[in-house]
């Protein structure tokens, strides 16, 4: 391991959503009807950018406490033109003096608009309806190779959203040849997306969503992990989140660890679940990147569940790193 440790967080084909609009309505509207929204929020989205935003907070809190500067996160994704206002808003959304390096992004100079997602949330039922639009061409395998040139040779970690499984598989297989010491994590989230299970066999760490697991008729996080562990790469860690029931992890030795989101008798007020899975991933990556040996696997899992639980109790991601680490300092995480 090099000191300072330089770890590249990289993702292929992340859907950037700097103009993600979240509209709250009294109830879901009927077709061809008019309804006044109760509220409107506009913020940057995208699975991996969300994860990086929370990871950046955790790293900053840790740096402030220990003066450590061993992790350097990168984002590799497709953005509109360098001069497009939307591109500037994406980068600015990470804050002044961001730890995230955007120099490896791919800019589509012919585009001015980012991918966008519009979320309609019903106050009556809590349901969320998403409408996506993306005119940006997806990243190709050759573009990924060019964008990540020269980044190998360190203690590296690549995280993929798993948007285009066939291309993602090419990228991971190329990494195994060109940078065999690199670790790879993959998110298996969207139900019905062909090719995701093939990625499980290639990754060191896999994150399964509850919606994907239920689409495969698994009744619990543990059942999903038991079934998928037979397909996984040897020595891998598999994680599956399950909403209010917390999450579970299958370890390289085959053991399964579970962690509830709340203690017995506890209740929380759920305000905003958008990005909770991305937040959980940030917590796990932080555990591996910054506390691989000082935290055991149960502590890593408990911490990630706690960060995600903090997230669903607020709008957006502000101060999640501070809140989660402060609770850990009070002895509220781990076993």
Predicted regions and their residues:
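Conserved short C-terminal alpha-helix that flanks the catalytic cleft of nucleotide-sugar-dependent
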Residues: 311-312
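Ribokinase/PfkB-type carbohydrate-kinase core domain
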Residues: 1-19, 64-71, 78, 92-264, ...
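Short, small-residue alpha-helix embedded
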Residues: 50-55, 270-297
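Thr-Gly-centered strand-to-loop micro-motif
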Residues: 38, 160, 186-187, 270, ...
């Amino acid at each position: 391991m090099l000191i300072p440790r330089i770890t590249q967080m990289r993702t292929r084909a992340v859907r950037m959503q700097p103009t993600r609009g979240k509209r709250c309505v009294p109830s879901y509207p009927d077709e061809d009807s008019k309804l006044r929204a109760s509220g409107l929020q506009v913020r940057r989205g995208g699975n991996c950018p969300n994860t990086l935003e929370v990871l950046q907070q955790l790293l900053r809190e840790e740096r402030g406490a220990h003066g450590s500067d061993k992790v350097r996160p990168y984002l590799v994704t497709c953005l509109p033109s360098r001069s497009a206002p939307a591109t500037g808003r994406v980068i600015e959304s990470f804050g002044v003096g961001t730890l995230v390096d955007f120099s490896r992004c791919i800019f589509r100079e012919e585009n001015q608009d980012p991918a966008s997602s519009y979320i309609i949330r019903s106050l009556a039922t809590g349901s969320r309806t998403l409408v996506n639009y993306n005119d940006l061409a997806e990243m190709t395998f050759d573009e990924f190779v060019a964008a990540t040139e020269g980044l190998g040779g360190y203690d590296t970690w690549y995280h993929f959203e798993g948007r285009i499984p066939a291309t993602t598989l090419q990228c991971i297989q190329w990494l195994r040849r060109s940078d065999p010491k690199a670790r790879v994590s993959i998110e298996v989230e969207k139900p019905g997306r062909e090719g995701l299970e093939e990625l499980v066999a290639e990754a060191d760490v896999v994150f399964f969503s509850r919606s994907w697991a239920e689409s495969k008729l698994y009744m619990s996080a543990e059942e999903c992990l038991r079934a998928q562990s037979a397909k996984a790469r040897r020595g891998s860690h598999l994680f599956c989140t399950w909403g209010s029931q917390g999450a579970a992890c299958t370890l390289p030795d085959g053991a399964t660890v579970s962690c509830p989101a709340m203690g017995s008798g506890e209740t929380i007020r759920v305000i905003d679940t958008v990005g909770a899975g991305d937040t959980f991933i940030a917590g796990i990556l932080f555990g591996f990147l910054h506390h691989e040996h000082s935290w055991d696997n149960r502590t890593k899992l408990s911490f990630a569940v706690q960060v995600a639980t903090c997230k669903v109790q607020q709008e957006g991601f502000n101060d999640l790193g501070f809140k989660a680490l402060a609770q850990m300092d009070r002895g509220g995480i781990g076993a």
